[in-house]
């Protein structure tokens, strides 16, 4: 993981308005140490349906090999938006405008993100840090909270300073098992929060910003992920995937 020194001047669309923004230096997750990757691609920025494929490699110098068959997923109800953590920009923008991921935009983040923990409604074996959901388990989406973009137990966090959160156990079947996606890991205010892999409502309905799939595939992912292999989610529209495939050394997809 390296800090890149290039600074780009670009136009971003936030809350429907185009603004000029010069980003500070950001960390790009090159996942040099990753041995597991979940690749999610969509047709374009606005498409809700997409495809996921698992990959693994034996060493950091090995070629990525696909694991099992690809399967369908859905992303945010409004498609994808570029993560503010990345300072390299895609060329396949929407009419020259680049949508950046923001809180409450109904879009899933595009980029490369660590997969850091698993949650479930019941106890289960896990090779990632595990959280069993309780009535008091919440993911905080209040941008003014010190716990913004964290899964917490409201009775143990200490400073209960938020006015908005997701009561995870009450979500029901869609959160029977899921994975925390470390998007906005620096917890930049308004950069987006509570992004998960989880079970979908159905194959047509987009999410509030997560990536969702059939229960059997979510279970398979939860059993497969291993913290020792530094797993990542690589999530991009197909044209952006092709743009960065060589530079970021992304897994080769079947045509």
How would you label these PLM feature ranges?
Residues 210:
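Short cysteine clusters
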Residues 213:
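A conserved hydrophobic position in a structured secondary element of the catalytic/binding core
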Residues 1-21:
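Bacterial Sec-dependent N-terminal signal peptides
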Residues 18-207, 216-255:
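Cell wall/extracellular polymer interaction/catalysis modules
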């Amino acid at each position: 993981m390296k800090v890149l020194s290039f600074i780009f001047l670009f136009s971003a669309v936030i809350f429907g308005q185009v603004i000029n923004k010069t980003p500070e230096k950001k960390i790009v997750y090159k996942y040099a140490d990753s041995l597991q990757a979940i690749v999610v691609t969509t047709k374009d920025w606005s498409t809700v349906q997409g495809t996921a494929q698992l990959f693994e490699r034996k060493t950091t110098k090995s070629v990525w090999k696909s694991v099992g068959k690809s399967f369908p997923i859905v992303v945010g109800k409004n498609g994808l938006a570029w993560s503010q953590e990345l300072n390299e920009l895609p060329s396949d923008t929407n009419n020259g405008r680049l949508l950046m991921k923001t809180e409450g935009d109904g879009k899933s983040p595009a980029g490369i993100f660590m997969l850091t923990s698993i949650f479930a409604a019941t106890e289960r074996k896990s090779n990632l840090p595990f959280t069993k959901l309780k009535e008091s388990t919440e993911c905080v989406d209040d941008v003014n909270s010190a716990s913004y973009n964290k899964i917490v137990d409201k009775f143990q966090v200490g400073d209960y300073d938020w006015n908005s959160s997701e009561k995870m156990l009450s979500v029901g079947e869609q959160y029977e098992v899921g994975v925390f996606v470390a998007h906005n890991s620096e917890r930049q205010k308004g950069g987006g929060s509570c992004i998960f892999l989880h079970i979908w409502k159905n194959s047509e309905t987009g999410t509030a910003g997560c990536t969702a799939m059939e229960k059997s595939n979510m279970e398979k992912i939860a059993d497969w992920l291993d913290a020792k292999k530094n797993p990542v989610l690589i999530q991009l529209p197909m044209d952006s995937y092709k743009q960065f495939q060589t530079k970021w050394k992304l897994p080769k997809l079947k045509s």
